[in-house]
Every structure is written in C-alpha cells, then in structure tokens.
Amino acid sequence: MRPRLWLLLAAQLTVLHGNSVLQQTPAYIKVQTNKMVMLSCEAKISLSNMRIYWLRQRQAPSSDSHHEFLALWDSAKGTIHGEEVEQEKIAVFRDASRFILNLTSVKPEDSGIYFCMIVGSPELTFGKGTQLSVVDFLPTTAQPTKKSTLKKRVCRLPRPETQKGPLCSPITLGLLVAGVLVLLVSLGVAIHLCCRRRRARLRFMKQFYK
C-alpha cells in the first residue's frame, strides 16, 4: 500500500481528538474570497526529524468523515504536496516550533476544518483543528445610531420700535402750555390775595394800638 494511502486510512481509523502536544491557532477564521490565510500549528515537543502533516476535512467530524492530505513539512525536503492539490496555492514552512500552512487565493470550496498531525509509533497525534470559512462578502457591522439632540429654541422679545419724528404733537404741546399758564395765573392770584390779607392785618393792628 502506498504511504499516502496508508496515511489517509490511518486517519480514518484513528479516533480524532485534540492534543496539547500540537496547538493550532486560530480556532476559527473567516476570510473573503481570493485572500491569503495562514494557519499555525505549534509543537510542544522536539520534532527534529519528525514530519508535520496538514489535513483538511470538509464536513463536521464523524465516523464517515473524509480527510484530505494537503501537504507535509519535512526537515530535509521542505514542503511535499498531496495528490490533486494545487501546489501554487499551498505551502508549508517552519518558524521555530511553529509550522505554518499558507493558503493563497482561497475559494469557498476551501472551507473546512484544517488539522495538523504527526505520525507516532503507532498512534497519530492531531491538533484541535482550525475551522476556515471562505465567503464572498464579509458581514459589515452596523454603525451605532447617534441620538439627535434637540436644540432649544430661544424666544426673543421684539425690540421696541424707536419713535421717529417729533416727540409731542401740537395738541399735546398746547395743553402743556395752557396748563403752565393756568398754574402761573393761580400762583399770581394766590400771591395777590396773600398780600391783601397782610395789608389788611397791618391796618387792623395800627387801629387797635392808637
């Protein structure tokens, strides 16, 4: 049996479970069509001569799940691609203890769960997986509506109109003059009567003392 076919068969028969030895990030990612995606698998053990495999599962994990072998990283050969894989879209490289799966120009059919895996003796060790969702349009977040503030209306009192022209009409002016004349006449009469009374009092006193 060819090694790659054996690998796929082993992945089908092995119970799939997340392991702390291989930590995958992020757990979920949603990207737009034709974008680039980088999935990380960090090994918590020394993998000097061990290969890291990347598999894809297009449906939710189950007993009938099918795993596609995409590529592996080999310390001597670098990236080795699986059969019927677009090699120009998939690359695997190492960055210290992390193994990166790089996907370019992703399409909606690339959506699925991506697992990194190492082959032990005899067990297989899987990461917890990264779910990739490729969509044509990313959802837009609605902007919070701003409350409109009501402006207070300022009531302004009408300005008093300045009177143009003469302040007093001729009739009013005539009445004022007449009133002044009446006061003067009354004052003159009062003074005259007062003087006459004084003279009469003086004459009476002179007659009394004779």
Curated annotation (Swiss-Prot):
Q: Name one GO cellular component term.
A: extracellular region
Q: Where does the secretion signal sit in this chain?
A: 1-21
- Where on the chain is Phosphotyrosine found, per UniProt? 209
Q: How is the protein altered post-translationally, as described in the entry? A: Phosphorylated as a consequence of T-cell activation.
Question: Which stretches make up the Ig-like V-type domain?
Answer: 22-132
List the GO biological process terms. Answer: adaptive immune response; cell surface receptor protein tyrosine kinase signaling pathway; immune response; T cell activation; T cell receptor signaling pathway
- Carbohydrate attachment residues: 102
Q: Which residues lie on this side of the membrane: Extracellular?
A: 22-170
Asked if Phosphoprotein is a keyword of the record, the answer is yes
- Membrane topology (Cytoplasmic): 192-210
Q: Which Pfam family, any one of them, does this sequence belong to?
A: V-set
For whether the record's keyword set contains Lipoprotein, the answer is yes
**Which Cys-Cys disulphide bridges does the record give?**
41-116
Gene Ontology MF terms = coreceptor activity; MHC class I protein binding
Supply the alphabetized keyword list: Adaptive immunity, Cell membrane, Disulfide bond, Glycoprotein, Immunity, Immunoglobulin domain, Lipoprotein, Membrane, Palmitate, Phosphoprotein, Secreted, Signal, Transmembrane, Transmembrane helix
Database matches in SMART domains: IG, IGv
Query: What InterPro entries has UniProt attached to this entry?
Result: CD8B, Ig-like_dom, Ig-like_dom_sf, Ig-like_fold, Ig_sub, Ig_V-set
Describe its assembly: Forms disulfide-linked heterodimers with CD8A at the cell surface. Interacts with CD3D; this interaction couples TCR-CD3 with CD8. Interacts with LCK.
Q: What does this protein do?
A: Integral membrane glycoprotein that plays an essential role in the immune response and serves multiple functions in responses against both external and internal offenses. In T-cells, functions primarily as a coreceptor for MHC class I molecule:peptide complex. The antigens presented by class I peptides are derived from cytosolic proteins while class II derived from extracellular proteins. Interacts simultaneously with the T-cell receptor (TCR) and the MHC class I proteins presented by antigen presenting cells (APCs). In turn, recruits the Src kinase LCK to the vicinity of the TCR-CD3 complex.
The cross-references to PANTHER family, in alphabetical order and at most eight, read: T-CELL SURFACE GLYCOPROTEIN CD8 BETA CHAIN, T-CELL SURFACE GLYCOPROTEIN CD8 BETA CHAIN-RELATED
Q: What is this protein called?
A: T-cell surface glycoprotein CD8 beta chain
Give the species this sequence originates from: Homo sapiens
Its gene name is CD8B
